[in-house]
Amino acid sequence: MASKNMVNPAVEPSMEDDLFAREVAEVKQWWSDPRWRYTKRPFTAEQIVSKRGNLKIEYPSNAQSKKLWKILEGRFQKRDASYTYGCLEPTMVTQMAKYLDTVYVSGWQSSSTASSSDEPGPDLADYPYTTVPNKVSHLFMAQLFHDRKQRHERLSAPKSERSKLQNIDYLRPIIADADTGHGGLTAVMKLTKLFIEKGAAGIHIEDQAPGTKKCGHMAGKVLVPISEHINRLVAIRAQADIMGVDLLAIARTDAEAATLITTSIDPRDHAFILGCTNPSLQPLADLMNTAEQSGKTGDQLQAIEDEWMAKANLKRFDDAVVDVINSSSSIRNPKDVAAKYLQAAKGKSNREARAIASSLGVPEIFFDWDSPRTREGYFRIKGGCDCAINRAIAYAPYADAIWMESKLPDYEQAKEFAEGVHAVYPEQKLAYNLSPSFNWKTAMPRDEQETYIRRLAGLGYCWQFITLAGLHTTALISDRFARAYSEVGMRAYGELVQEPEMELGVDVVKHQKWSGATYVDELQKMVTGGVSSTAAMGKGVTEDQFH
């Protein structure tokens, strides 16, 4: 009969402290690797080890993470780039593996094509948070399968014949979209755990508020304070450390185009928050509440808000100070005073900036950032590249790479961002979204399109990606084939699909072999002693027509 006080056989109490100390030493040794030379951890090895269980699990994600780091480190040092695109499904991941050294999993694509609720929708991160990890698993399992299949094929051939066979690296590291983390810090940690368990090598997380998250190229984006996003990055690193994995964390900022922020609590955000400079106006929220109570609705309310905004003369505090300096008759050499103010106020809180302005003899300034707040309570912010740089510098010690979401494929803006970040952290790796939301034809001529990736790489953008290329290429060939098929029947399949597959040597033309039928036949034969009357690739298989 079992004892009520059974001892855990995995832990000998007399050795528990020694085992703990040994594991702490191992973690400290791990963290001393050059891989972590720029990484800041606000927690200790003791804290990490105490959160681990007794069973040590080796995650494939760790091997993939190390591989990804080696790729990006090498590319960055050479001012080169790894570039890829959003992968939809296993067929695509096997074809990408021939030519590209990383794979991207897009939250946008997953939202529209692979939600774990089966309910499609736009990129608002309102799908279950298992959605993107499940897509990572879908692709990673395919990578593992095709790697096994290829290895079996090669080892089944004489060594002298193997040079004629494919030797594709199917295990390309996967970087996935973690959106805003789908909740609080424990949600971020659980999401990170899921990604690691599913095989991701890296994840990116953005500084938007979770409940109002938008695609990077939609309006209405609401930022969280810098401190909150740093906490998310720390949560990712802590969870990966608990699991013993070198997972890459990429910090994305949406500050370039953001117009709102949840709170003014972080002084690092103060310089970018907009305030009303018209003292004659009542707070917007009060005005709107009164209008609603009087029966105003819809367009009437919008007109009232638009009129208030036009009169409010919203400005950043620094801009308000400079305007007062330039218009004040009591200030001599306004240009010099403005320069002194801007230099002294950089990075300061609003309270400190007010004190600096006063010390320079600037008249008292009316600046009220509470007055323009939205009905949800959000503060208004003037984003821009300078705002994104400010955030990127704050995130850098906690992120392996940084990405600024932008409105256009603007090389000069990309250069400004890179130079701003590298002025403080010269070794910071950068990422860039080669978005299909951009109109590339109007953005730049074709010769510049061809060199754009290379030019960005020279600035330190060592990982670049087209988020939705999988979606768009699938839509394009589907539309083209469906139209032709409806018009000319099987001729469309021959001309648009099968013949090009054969001419280009696309392995999927032999789809039975591609799917692993030969490999699975060999599994059956192994189990049945070498003979199987039901082998899928035996006599009669129609794929013989393609030899």
From Swiss-Prot:
Cellular compartments per GO CC: glyoxysome
Subcellular localization, as worded in the UniProt entry: Glyoxysome
EC supergroup of this enzyme: lyase
GO molecular function: isocitrate lyase activity; metal ion binding; methylisocitrate lyase activity
E.C. numbers: 4.1.3.1, 4.1.3.30
GO biological process: glyoxylate cycle; tricarboxylic acid cycle
Protein name per Swiss-Prot or TrEMBL: Isocitrate lyase
Organism listed in the record: Pyricularia oryzae (strain 70-15 / ATCC MYA-4617 / FGSC 8958) (Rice blast fungus)
